[in-house]
Amino acid sequence: MTVRMDKRFADLRAENRPALITYFMGGDPDFQTSLGIMKALPEAGADVIELGMPFSDPMADGPAIQLAGQRALKGGQTLKTTLDLAREFRKQDNATPIVMMGYYNPIYIYGVEKFLDDAIASGIDGLIVVDLPPEMDDELCIPALARGINFIRLATPTTDGKRLPAVLKNTSGFVYYVSMNGITGSALPDPSLISGAVGRIKAHTELPVCVGFGVKTADHAKAIGAVADGVVVGSAIVNQIAGSLTKDGQATADTVPAVTTLVKGLSTGVRASRLAAAE
């Protein structure tokens, strides 16, 4: 783990509460608005920020995040300018961990070594690359770990006991449990099923297990936070951004406040989750 990631999860354990991990697409709908959103997230209650890397063929993403990526690409967002977002954010916040999430193709084109150098310089703490399985660890995972950048793996309901050790072998930072099969933005599954899955993963690792896909409301966050080390929210935030834009996809004065309001509510739910579990 990086020092920031280590410290954040240690602090959360001391507070006996799960992390709120918030995803948004870098550059959606434009660089400056995206930076405004990113800067507002920690004060609204985000503990870890997932920064989406826009890509033209996002196979694991639902319609909301696909459209966010299209808006970002249309506005000229690139992998370099996504790193620039993190670099600008670090000028005011050196405590909140940043995890870049996306696909391998843009990183490969950018150049793995150059990307890792620039990621470190920009204050990136971890990577989630959804289309790189453990069998391809030499491509990016091993070089990233050697540089001190966390490589966070996804586990799913179909990741069985045979596959799980391979998934977890080089995982660091936290484990991201995708609480259903399918694309992002789907419905929330039964929390009791999630509890069992989290326990199954924890039998194989001491890393925090964070749960995402389908979390949309404070009540969802409260329910998942009661059984997981972190709650990941993505599509709900992306939808909040989309709903604040003009018909032609431009930011309005409501865009950043709309996201802030949503995240504050989610944070309230997460902070109430352990109290609910203890009742």
Curated annotation (Swiss-Prot):
Keywords: Amino-acid biosynthesis, Aromatic amino acid biosynthesis, Lyase, Tryptophan biosynthesis. The alpha subunit is responsible for the aldol cleavage of indoleglycerol phosphate to indole and glyceraldehyde 3-phosphate. Its EC number is 4.2.1.20. It is an enzyme of class 4 (lyase). GO terms for molecular function: tryptophan synthase activity. Belongs to the TrpA family. InterPro entries: Aldolase_TIM, RibuloseP-bd_barrel, Trp_synthase_alpha_AS, Trp_synthase_suA. Pathway: Amino-acid biosynthesis; L-tryptophan biosynthesis; L-tryptophan from chorismate: step 5/5. HAMAP family: Trp_synth_alpha (MF_00131). The gene is trpA. GO terms for cellular component: cytosol. The keyword Hydrolase does not apply. The active site is at E50 (proton acceptor), D61 (proton acceptor). It catalyses: (1S,2R)-1-C-(indol-3-yl)glycerol 3-phosphate + L-serine = D-glyceraldehyde 3-phosphate + L-tryptophan + H2O. PANTHER family: TRYPTOPHAN SYNTHASE ALPHA CHAIN, CHLOROPLASTIC, TRYPTOPHAN SYNTHASE, ALPHA CHAIN. This is Tryptophan synthase alpha chain. CDD domains: Tryptophan_synthase_alpha (cd04724). Transmembrane segments: none annotated. Tetramer of two alpha and two beta chains.
